[in-house]
Curated annotation (Swiss-Prot):
The keyword Cell division applies. Belongs to the SepF family. It comes from Thermoanaerobacter pseudethanolicus (strain ATCC 33223 / 39E). The gene is sepF. This is Cell division protein SepF. One of its GO terms (biological process) is FtsZ-dependent cytokinesis. GO terms for cellular component: cytoplasm. InterPro entries: Cell_div_SepF (IPR023052), Cell_div_SepF/SepF-rel (IPR007561), SepF-like_sf (IPR038594).
Amino acid sequence: MSSKMIDKLMSFFGIDEPEEEKEEVDSLQPVIPYDRKPKIVNIHTQPQVKVLILKPEKFEQVMNICNELKNKKPVIVDLQKMDKNEAQRVVDFLSGAAYALNGEIKKISGYIFLVAPENFDITGDIKDEVNSLYNLN
């Protein structure tokens, strides 16, 4: 008998050998290696804010204070060594600069002021805080 006839008979009785199915292989795209470095970020670090203390003696030095304010650094300005009229001019100038840069200026005591940029938040009344710390009532 021919092999075809035997295959048909075996298939009819269900005893045929299973044919191996050929898997069709689609064209695969090559895998491109990706150099990925892990990004490790310490969530407990906060940027350290430095507060400058400047003691101008002349009105011409007010530009240095404004430059620090433009660089987003808070500045404590001590005007005690200045003439009262010049000190008033400095305060007026710094008030305008703080306003223009969306910052603020607060009087700490006497002739001492805090000039802060917009990224620096001042809460509460500083004069009350200083007075309560040193019992200056």
